[in-house]
Amino acid sequence: EGTRPGDSAADVLARCDGVACEDTRVTGKLMKHLGLSKPLWRYDDHANERDRARLVESMHDRAIALVSDAGTPLVSDPGYRLVNDCRAAGVAVTTLPGACAVVAGLTLSGLPNDRFLFGGFLPSKEKARRDVLEELGSVDATLVFYETGPRLLKSLAAVSEVLGAREVAVARELTKLHEECRRGLPDGLTAYYDANPPKGEIVLLIGPADPGDVEHDIDALLTEAMTELKASQA
């Protein structure tokens, strides 16, 4: 079943034949709030190829809605595999606009948003985290990552060490009662959140490098290369 322009999520949930969701308990509460009763199928990080195949097969004669517990499905979410399989099987797919922490964080932060790069969650291991920041640090765009409260301080420390004094924003609990967005340099934010441990879901945004800083980095690399070349020729 196709959706009409302007359809809301509630419209689609009312008309669909069933719902694939991260947690049937969470989505069950939503359906109850809407006064709806539909079959619910769990689809999360643990879903395998067989689970997807069953869902795709059911979609040839039924309309199935895919929802997440929070935010937009498929953004840092396993739903993209299901959509990929649907397209491969010739199943029609459509989407609805909705809440997305990446976009909400960008608009709230005030950092440049004409160009941005979403990197999902930063790795939990220190070296891997540094490697990602070094790899993406030269991109002329605002970098956006998802983060958790317990790991935020380590990520801010890595940003300070790898990228230096770049403007950073920490947005958390977006669209909720305790929404907060703090902006500053990594060391200052580290001090604040060390004294005020953050809770909830977090979006970490890192502003692009100042053009002057990039030129300085290039000059430093050239100087280092020339020094190594002279040493090898000595």
Where would I find each of the regions flagged by the language model?
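Class I SAM-dependent methyltransferase SAM-binding "motif I" and its flanking Rossmann-like core
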Residues: 81-139
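Glycine-rich, flexible N-terminal cofactor/catalytic loop recognition
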Residues: 1-46
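Glycine/small-residue-rich loop that forms an oxyanion/phosphate-binding "nest" at active or ligand-binding sites
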Residues: 52-100, 104
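A contiguous loop/helix-start segment that scaffolds small-molecule binding in enzyme catalytic cores
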Residues: 63, 142, 149-233
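Short active-site oxyanion
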Residues: 12-19, 90-94, 142-143
